[in-house]
Design a protein with these regions (language model features):
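Conserved N-terminal ligand/cofactor-binding loop architecture of enzyme catalytic domains
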Residues: 1-46, 64-167, 214, 218-283, ...
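A short, glycine/small-residue-rich beta-strand->loop->alpha-helix junction that serves as a flexible
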Residues: 47-57, 187, 313-319
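Histidine-anchored nucleotide/phosphate-binding helix
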Residues: 51-69, 73-78, 197-199, 322-337
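Donor nucleotide-activated moiety binding/catalytic core segment of transferases
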Residues: 164-178, 298, 342, 352, ...
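Conserved nucleotide-sugar donor-interacting segment of glycosyltransferase catalytic cores
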Residues: 169-224
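A donor-sugar binding/catalytic signature common to diverse glycosyltransferases
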Residues: 187, 213, 220, 377-424
Length: 569
């Protein structure tokens, strides 16, 4: 059957998109200014993930390092090859290499069959011994993402093929690196079948690898220096550097962080998570509305329990005390059922509907105890936060949002902000369950929780003052980003130049996280992707009205002492 031609309106839209893309890419190409490249040898450029902002990030990196197209090889995956080729052509990249992980590989299929033969539970997969010491958690997460299930489905008729694909991806990674002997890899992610394999093998070989990531409208590039860095990739300060922050910088970060969190929970942030969490104004409610709807006593504390999207790479931040998010929820529910000192409000991830697939409600029993309720998805996130007294989360931004109000935060274990001293961080699964069984939310130091979390929010959500205005949209906006990108690049050429100069300095420094590198060298801070009529600059060295106490660099960052004697039921 012949492919149906585009309608006139669709054809015009396609032509407009192509023109927007060409103009945006031309601005990036024309800005290349380095006389000699910062990297010798072959550079492998990821083209397996097509997104306007990925090519923005690549263009900034090319400009910053003076990379030459003749040294580059475009890596193509199974999807969006035409679009990626078109973008690469704008940079005069002509060589390409296909990452053929979908090929029928007899050896990989046989090995997949052998691994699955003695696999009885999803937990068994996490104990597999894989080639090149590849982490089974990454294989688990890649398959889980495809299945869109809460836990890996062993009855999936395609499971053998999925495991074989993961094993083939490792073979393809080895063959690709052997063939091209690259000096540098530029990747969009270090997740999924082909990119997790490439990043792991490259790190084991000591090949320089930079992931061109972005978040909150800004560039969040990071580099792998060790294989285990694949589980530690969220832009962050090390604990000792956080403790050593000079008071004036901590204050400026806290002021900016507080302003950003306020804008975020007010529904003014443009990232996809915040849009779904806080821009739903259909039902805004008071605490009494919550207790009335749930038939709860108004005086009993309400603890929010925020559940992550079940199949969104659960192990990506080193989440190693649980099989997956479903396992965490399943072991938490009986403890919450026994702890009647609080009412527990279960909230599914706000993006679950957008993602599709299984969600929190699919895991819950038909009947819950009266003191455990399910938060309706229509309830506004800011109103829910205001109604709750504390929160339990794995590693969600809810921890920062609650802590900004001085409310206690209990984590399931390690995440990306676990060791900054504002949240209770259990070191083991059993310690988490022991704490969960107690009234852990009592006697919290609200001022300390708020102060420390706002500093982290400043580092995580905000950006340097000199960059104010150069904020890009969310990757989920897809092709609509091209037009906005052109406008931003045209409006802020000097800021783009400064960004590239810092990118060059960061690459030479050897530090892992670009955004942190940039923030620690700034003399002022402002909100990033929060819509506002004017931006406030929070200067280092200026007295802070919001946070007056300097960060105590001698303070131990161990979690607050919690009496782990179980409460009476």
């Amino acid at each position: 059957m012949a492919k149906r031609a585009l309608s006139p309106s669709a054809r015009r839209e396609r032509q407009r998109l192509v023109a927007d893309r060409a103009r945006a890419l031309a601005l990036l190409v024309d800005g290349s200014r380095a006389d000699s490249p910062a990297v010798d040898g072959t550079i492998l450029v990821d083209g397996s993930w097509y997104n306007a902002h990925y090519w923005l990030r690549f263009g900034l990196m090319l400009r910053a390092l003076g990379l030459k197209p003749e040294s580059m090889v475009l890596l193509l995956g199974p999807y969006s090859r035409r679009e990626s080729r078109n973008c690469a052509a704008a940079f005069n990249i002509v060589r390409e290499h296909i990452l053929d992980i979908d090929r029928r590989d007899a050896a990989a299929t046989a090995e997949a069959r052998r691994l699955l033969k003695d696999t009885q539970t999803p937990d068994d997969v996490l104990n597999w011994k894989l080639p090149h010491d590849f982490p089974p958690a990454q294989l688990y997460d890649s398959i889980l993402k495809e299945q869109r299930k809460a836990s890996l489905d062993l009855d999936d008729p395609q499971l053998e093929g999925r495991v074989a694909k993961a094993l083939t991806a490792l073979d393809v990674a080895v063959q690709t690196l052997d063939m091209h002997q690259p000096s540098l890899l530029l990747l969009s992610h270090a997740l999924n079948y082909e990119l997790s394999a490439l990043s792991w093998i490259a790190a084991k070989r000591g090949i320089a690898t930079v992931v061109l990531f972005g978040n909150f409208g800004t560039q969040r590039f990071w580099r792998l220096t060790r294989p285990e860095d694949v589980f530690d990739w969220c832009d962050r300060l090390e604990r000792e550097d956080f403790e050593a922050l000079e008071p004036s910088r901590a204050d400026a970060l806290a002021e900016a962080g507080g302003e950003h969190v306020t804008g975020r929970v007010s529904g003014k942030s443009t990232d996809i998570g915040a849009i779904h969490a806080f821009q739903n104004d259909t039902i805004s409610l008071e605490r009494t509305s919550v207790t009335s709807a749930m038939k709860w006593d108004a005086e009993t504390p309400i603890i929010g329990v925020y559940v992550s999207n079940l199949f969104d790479y659960p192990h990506c931040f080193g989440f190693d005390q649980y099989r997956d998010f479903a396992d965490w929820l399943e072991v938490s529910l009986p403890v919450m059922a026994a702890n009647r000192k609080a009412n527990w409000l279960l909230r599914a991830h706000p993006c679950d509907v957008w993602y599709g697939g299984q969600s929190m409600v699919d895991l819950l029993p038909p009947e819950l105890p009266a003191h455990i309720g399910i938060c309706p998805k229509e309830w506004n996130g800011a109103a829910v936060k205001a109604a709750c007294d504390a929160v339990v989360t794995c590693h969600g931004t809810a921890g920062l949002e609650y802590a900004a109000d001085g409310k206690p935060v209990l984590l399931s274990g390690k995440g990306w902000y676990h060791d900054y001293g504002f949240a209770i961080w259990p070191k083991t699964r059993q310690e988490y369950l022991d704490i969960l069984s107690t009234p852990w939310w009592r006697d919290a130091n609200s001022a300390e929780i708020r102060r420390r979390s706002l500093i982290v929010s400043g580092l995580s959500f905000c950006m340097p003052g000199w960059q104010c205005g150069l904020v890009f949209g969310d990757d989920s906006e897809q092709d609509a980003l091209w037009s906005a990108m052109e406008s931003r690049l045209s409006e802020y050429p000097d800021t783009v130049d400064q960004e590239c100069e810092l990118l060059s300095a960061w690459f030479a420094s050897g530090e892992r996280f670009f955004h942190t590198f940039k923030m620690m060298r700034a003399d002022s801070y402002c909100m990033s992707n929060v819509t506002t009529d004017h931006a406030t600059l929070h200067h280092v060295g200026t007295e802070s009205a919001a946070i007056s106490a300097p960060i105590d660099s001698s303070k131990d960052l161990s979690p607050p002492t919690v009496n782990t004697t179980a409460v009476n039921t």
